[in-house]
Structure formats: structure tokens, C-alpha cells
Amino acid sequence: GPDSSFLRL
């Protein structure tokens, strides 16, 4: 979802 890039932090 759109949060995927955030979770990669």
C-alpha cells in the first residue's frame, strides 16, 4: 500500500 515506502525506513 502507500505506506510501503515508509515501512522501509
Curated annotation (Swiss-Prot):
One of its GO terms (biological process) is neuropeptide signaling pathway. The modification Leucine amide is found at L9. This is Extended FMRFamide-3. It comes from Austrophasma rawsonvillense (Gladiator). It comes from the Eukaryota. GO terms for cellular component: extracellular region. FMRFamides and FMRFamide-like peptides are neuropeptides. It is found in: Secreted.
